[in-house]
């Protein structure tokens, strides 16, 4: 019996850098293979807070497979936590993106206690490099004082305007690492340790991004009761206030007053995000007959929506890096994104997408695209090429090979 289409597509190319040759060229593939060979045996351990939902998971899932396929032993461990712990770490996330709320002594105690319990479960004696992702497991480094291997902390959050008090607290942990890695240079902080900058990337061979025919994508939308006889506008993201779903709904309503269209909000909630369900309920109370809210965990639906949408929105008010922006651009979509964080590095306004700061600007761009069918084709072609050049997983893989070459423990 053959694999289901979802399984078959989800495994295409995950293990082989050679799959990328038609996209990045033979010389780039050879360079990556040479870097991996020169590293020799190495063991890298990633530590994060969830296997499900969110950008870190989207990145580490294919990256760990590709590194193992290259002969770099790469493991991925999760920390466990109580609902109270994840409520605290969500608050940390929000404050790092500029929320002015305070982090109480009780919350600090919960945060540090749960991380200390997780340290007891981790056995890292045989690895060459430890990579810790985002604030949730950050204090782990303090529980391995006799460590001999380098520790790297990678922050995937928009740190352009962090809450000063909370950042000062977390900085005491960050400065115990050998290096802090941020998505963009504008997130750099005043730190006593080295800082590096590594932008995220997408896997073009995953079920979410692999090629899909017009008939396949239309059929997928129909299965989910999405009308295909009028233009579709979509935003695909976590249900999170930083993604501004209420602003998306308002921009859509203003655009719909001029051009008939449908809005599809598709999202899921990561297991380390306790606020998501509250936001989802808020959205559901705000919708009307022209707005569809879906929570399906279906990468093929994401693929189909990004291919068929007349406009893809990512109207974030904070965004470390918009993976959904890159995914949609890879499919030749016109993306209207918030003029914040990493989105400003992904979209060159008016060239390969549009940047907006207000609801009214978003509505005007939606109408502009709907009234100019050729614009999507012209702008979409430039969008896809910019992703091919800068934001494919092969580039991220090479960045990690360079990090390992610089920091690994030579036994």
Q: Predicted regions span which residues?
A:
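Conserved donor-binding/catalytic core segment of Leloir-type glycosyltransferases
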Residues: 222-243, 263-264
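A conserved mid-protein helix/loop that constitutes part of the nucleotide-sugar donor-binding site
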Residues: 58, 240-254
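Short alpha-helical segment that forms part of, or immediately flanks, the ligand-binding pocket
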Residues: 303, 326-330, 344-345, 351
